[in-house]
């Protein structure tokens, strides 16, 4: 699979084009790697190397000159700087230093944390060129083989094996489109991989979205870890459907529900479909028309009881609410203290639903700590968040997720939930959308995700 990705190897060495012994040695290593199927990006400039490492996010490996770096502070900073920019988005990218045995043993302590990120030190003048090239190739292959997240990896593997499509969809991996001029134009525009990977649920090695098995289950579990959830479910028809799944799994006719007046229309559809009785939470609004948050006192037991008493459909009922839904962030971009809402509703509500359609990035930067649904497990309600992954992360249109955080008192009944899930999810899911959810989750994993959010802060 590694050759299919066509990720090049970056070599940064001041003698890469020079008529020196070191230059000749580095060029021989590059030639050996090219014979092994790798493309090489060579540069003799440390500054250019840093630019490539920071902007080319499709590298298989980096080789960087480090001869004399232990005694030369400028050379050492070149190496350290390249390591830092490369690892910002690719924490597992293998980076080798090129030099002699004594290259970095005299480096100062403050540089050692970065130098310890090196995969290894290649001794240019002690080992043979084929041996050195094999060291690099093995590290690059290992990195690329482990790069893809589980479902996307399985989809790429299945498509790359050139399997025939003996099932739906009817275009048969794109073959049908090639049978007419307009279809041929469609095929050329979208490309063969897009069409060959448009598959049916009849491919068992890809798992089942409806049963949450195989690589799809692994992808959902990995996304749950990345977003801080106990359970995550991929949704292929947007957060409007994700919201309806949550409600149909948790709410029954005549249940009391607390509803943010500033909610999406899918919440209103959910009320109609379930037959629940809404009690509305009124958000604030300033003189400019900007919608602010719901005041905290709206969530108090006394306020909830007052809403019940004022509603002719609920008068006389106990103040026990099945589900509360809050739009977080608001449509004007203001976010709630989610943990405070959880605690305030702990004795009043069974299920708390944060509609975070425009807020899927919050889990990946400390700036938002405490202000998103999956942040902290609290006593009281079972917590759902619904994310329009396609709106603010890198995913195809309609790609959404449902995240669930169990509380100490309430855990998700997965079997019951899945009945509602299967009610709303197509039995012919679009695998490109699912793969984009898997990739969106993997992109935000670890320090790479934080760096993406920090970049938006810096640009703002």
Model-flagged regions — what are they?
Residues 2-33, 41-42, 62, 96, ...:
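Conserved acidic segment of CheY-like receiver
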Residues 15-17, 68, 97-105, 127-128, ...:
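Short beta-alpha junction loops
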Residues 21-27, 46-49, 58-90, 100-108:
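Conserved phosphotransfer microenvironments
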Residues 43-46, 84, 108, 245-252, ...:
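Conserved PLP-enzyme active-site core in the AAT-like
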Residues 44, 99-135:
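Output/docking surface of receiver
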Residues 47-52, 241-242:
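Short alpha-helical segment
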Residues 126-213:
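N-terminal "arm"/small-domain region of PLP-dependent enzymes with the aminotransferase-like
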Residues 192-241:
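Conserved N-terminal alpha-helix of the aminotransferase class I/II PLP-enzyme fold
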